[in-house]
Amino acid sequence: NTILIVVVGTLSSTIMTAIGAYVMSRKPFPFQKAMMLMMIFTMYFSGGMIPDYILRNNWLHLGNNRLVLILPALVSTYNLIVMRTGFAAIPDSLEESARIDGASEFTILMRIIIPVALPCMAVIILFYAVSYWNSWFEASIYLTDRKKYPLQVILREILIVNSTTEMQVGESGNAQAIGESIKYATIMVATVPILLIYPFLQKYFVKGIMVGAVKG
């Protein structure tokens, strides 16, 4: 479940973020600033837990569906702004030469913008992967079928059961040792997969952060 959510969510979010960032980074269009302000507004203010639950469960009918963990978080405003800044740093002359050769907007995005901004894309992919991998709160609320639980929810349940067992057994040395071992094991299980991915993206990470943070 976790691998499926991370892979599908990361790919979908990266594609949608790249499309949105490309549109927002090109020549100004009507209501562009208003749209950007609306996106930034969502970074600081949310509708709250109850309206969010009603939206996902009653209106979108995503209750007990893995898509409930992907669709509402499909595009991160912060990642969109970072990628938009990275795309905006690419010279317009590259696009103009491609348009002269008859390239469409989609071709320009896939053949020119994304390859040039690959370091920035790698950073965004890592951000989304870590976000989906660590997500557990939404799953604990919207998923009722244990077969659909991601790894983080299972690890959380293990820690809760372990804490309850420690309280029942008492503060004996063996109980504490077992409890600490379980905690360290869950930390390793939750952390190692991301640590294995990072070395492959490390060469892009610093460069991508700089491209996305500084224009020009």
Role assignments for model-derived ranges:
Residues 1-216:
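A hydrophobic, multi-pass inner-membrane permease signature
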